[in-house]
Amino acid sequence: MKQIDFDHGTVIGNILGAALPMLVAQILSLLYNIVDRIYIARIPSVGTTALGAVGLCFPIIVIITAFSNLFGSGGAPLFSINRGKGNIKKAEAIMNTSFSMLCICGVALMVIGMLFASPILVLFGASEEGLSYAYPYMMIYLIGTVPSMIATGMNPFINAQGYATSGMLSVTIGAVANLILDPLFIFGLNLGIKGAAIATIISQTLSAAYVFYFLRKKAELKVRVLSKGEWKACRDDAKNIVSLGSAGFIMQLTNSLVTICCNSVLSGIGGDVYISVMTIVSSVRQMVETPIYAINEGTSPILSYNYGAQRPKKVKKAICVLTCMILIYTAIAWSVIIFEPEFLIGIFSTDSELLADCVEALKLYFAAFIFMDLQYVGQTVFKSLNKKKQAIFFSLLRKVFIVVPLTYLFPYAFHMGTKGVFLAEPISNVIGGSLCFITMLVMLKRSI
């Protein structure tokens, strides 16, 4: 199995070698998420309502993903840093601790989610009609919580060992399965929105099975569940994993919080149709962020490994490459969103009323999206170099202290209606992104 040489390869070569397979994997993953929504939106008679119902489930799905990344993205940089130092036993212990915590947390989230799914969805803004579609979708989705968390949380450990192609394959397996199963279950078996959920959990289970098989049988460092007697010895590892992973965890939880707040305000001001508008806007954002995520995650192990190996020049060069790649890509993506929004919206729905409302919302929401690049770069660097405090602070700043208050302030205090909800995002991009990037530059000057 081909492995990236972190010691002797060039910085640009290593980043591209890690990022390109991940980009392919993420595009396929995006496709199966997006295709899910495209098919759901085209269910006869109830498509728009069903699409909004799936949007109501997003916060719960994001919370599950956040816990996956708490242990996966928290453990993988520490794993890479210790590999860079040559401390292989420590690296292996970190991976096994992450895996064990993922499994335990997955079971707990599944049980809690199933017990409280209905009141949670109502709290998130579900109407009586919306709940009739969101509840069955969510209950089925929750069955696959553990496989979903293993597939998402353990894949970074495949990439961290330099097996970028295998990391890509793990995502590809689930994506292809979902692309095949979605139309079969939704339309062929006439299961509607329930069919979409069933297709998703089968696909996630296939991905998880491959990830576990590879890390158990093929990878250089092998994964296993910690024995009862090992937990005490790995307590410090668990604390460090959670501490570093808290930044990404908080960032995703705050994304979920923002979605909840937006849905709540939009439902009260604009009705269920604006829940569907927000679902489409969020879907476009997911499309745009996919290559950015691949570049970030492809760069992260290179940053961590060279930081652990005490090669500051390579660390700085990797940051420069990361920044340039993301800025160039985002400039192109932003131009498409601003000048051809109808094309992107049309991917998800042909509803004329929805299209008219979405165009303005999309342009407002993405007005200053280029400034988000600064946040992406800063957060990736903080996480990769084990700078926990900065990573956590900037995860909270943009969403909790800027977006959430403005989401309520603009529509109600300034009487801006639904426009105010979408305007909160670009303002937070400018303030949060700029402060995060400046802090990263100061940190690099002082400590590297």
Give names to the regions the model predicted.
Residues G17-D36, I140, G174, S203-S207, ...:
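Transmembrane helical elements of multi-pass membrane transporters/channels
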Residues N69-G72, Y141-N159, G167-N178, A196-V211, ...:
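Short runs within selected transmembrane alpha-helices of multi-pass transporters and secretion channels
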Residues L51-V111, S148-G167, N263, I275-S335, ...:
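Small-residue-rich hydrophobic transmembrane alpha-helices
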Residues L23, I27, L31, V35, ...:
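Generic alpha-helical transmembrane segments of integral inner-membrane proteins
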Residues I27, L31-L51, L121-E128, L184-L191, ...:
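Helix-terminus/linker motif at the lipid-water interface of multi-pass membrane proteins
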